[in-house]
């Protein structure tokens, strides 16, 4: 009798611990479950767009409520730039019994370079992950919502915010553009676009990992090393009589898009705008020779003269010039 009881208990433990795991993606998900989550998600999006924390906080789990002040700050930062109708769901996942040591993973696939995985804390037997972004923006903001089912109710367990795309291109798109520039010998453009790519690698912060993330980071190291081997900054533009000194080139965002921004020191009085403008014209006439491809590959280039290389503490006069190439 005692032996039968032990065997029955052991069988019960085995059956409980071996509950089949389940992961469904997008159209594979039960429509009823999807409908429940979409109702909650729309309320949360409304809360962010309207900057009404109570709409979001009432749907949060007890654990997430411990970060209520962080949520309020995030809402204040982004609410003025969001429109509810611009939110698009990229992917969504339903999981059941899918965690190992309270960690679960969702993956978009293993074939496309754009594929990614998200590794997150799974607090409930049933979990649901929604990844979406706001399309009408130069910097397309991404939100990742992780819901858990407690009893009969779904609650928001985690919320991550980041940037998915810049100018409708994600990290992989910018990486491909950077590789194309690199193959043409356009090192400055390659390093600028690689910089944008690496900025976009973590739309859900450290939870998100693109399938080819390591490849992108290795390329970044490669192109950075080659760029600084070829170009020894600071660079004096000796063909311009005032001898301006270029000390930094990076990609800058303006309403028209992202373009190379060239920072340089000048010997000209910073109050003499006409002379500064003429000097900039002369720099621009030589910049294509100095940096291969920069004038043929970009619609415009941004220039910022300074009296000295900034140390980070002083406040100096700064002017900017935009020179169009085509």
PLM regions: where:
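Surface-exposed, charged secondary-structure patches
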Residues: 76-140, 168, 225-268
């Amino acid at each position: 009798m005692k032996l039968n009881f032990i065997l029955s208990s052991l069988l019960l433990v085995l059956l409980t611990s071996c509950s089949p795991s389940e992961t469904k993606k997008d159209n594979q998900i039960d429509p009823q479950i999807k409908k429940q989550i979409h109702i909650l998600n729309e309320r949360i999006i409304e809360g962010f767009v309207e900057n009404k924390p109570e709409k979001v906080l009432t749907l949060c789990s007890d654990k997430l409520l411990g970060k209520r002040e962080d949520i309020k700050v995030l809402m204040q930062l982004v609410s003025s730039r969001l429109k509810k109708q611009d939110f698009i769901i990229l992917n969504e996942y339903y999981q059941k019994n899918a965690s190992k040591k309270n960690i679960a993973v969702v993956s978009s696939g293993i074939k496309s370079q754009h594929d990614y995985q998200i590794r997150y804390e799974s607090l409930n037997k049933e979990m649901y992950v929604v990844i979406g972004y706001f399309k009408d923006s130069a910097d397309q903001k991404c939100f990742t919502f992780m819901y858990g089912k407690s009893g009969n109710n779904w609650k928001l367990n985690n919320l991550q915010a980041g940037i998915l795309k810049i100018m409708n291109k994600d990290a992989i798109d910018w990486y491909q553009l950077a590789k194309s520039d690199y193959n043409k010998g356009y090192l400055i453009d390659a390093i600028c676009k690689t910089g944008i790519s690496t900025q976009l690698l973590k739309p859900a912060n450290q939870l998100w990992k693109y399938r080819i993330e390591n490849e992108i980071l290795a390329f970044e190291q490669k192109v950075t090393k080659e760029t600084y081997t070829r170009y020894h900054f600071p660079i004096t533009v000796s063909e311009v009589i005032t001898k301006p000194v270029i000390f930094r080139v990076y990609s800058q965002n303006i309403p028209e898009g992202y373009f190379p921004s060239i920072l340089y020191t000048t010997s000209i009085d910073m109050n003499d705008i006409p002379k500064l403008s003429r000097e900039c014209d002369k720099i621009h006439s030589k910049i294509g020779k100095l940096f291969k491809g920069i004038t043929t590959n970009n619609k415009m280039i941004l220039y910022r003269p300074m009296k000295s290389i900034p140390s980070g503490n002083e406040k100096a006069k700064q002017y900017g010039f935009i020179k169009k190439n085509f």
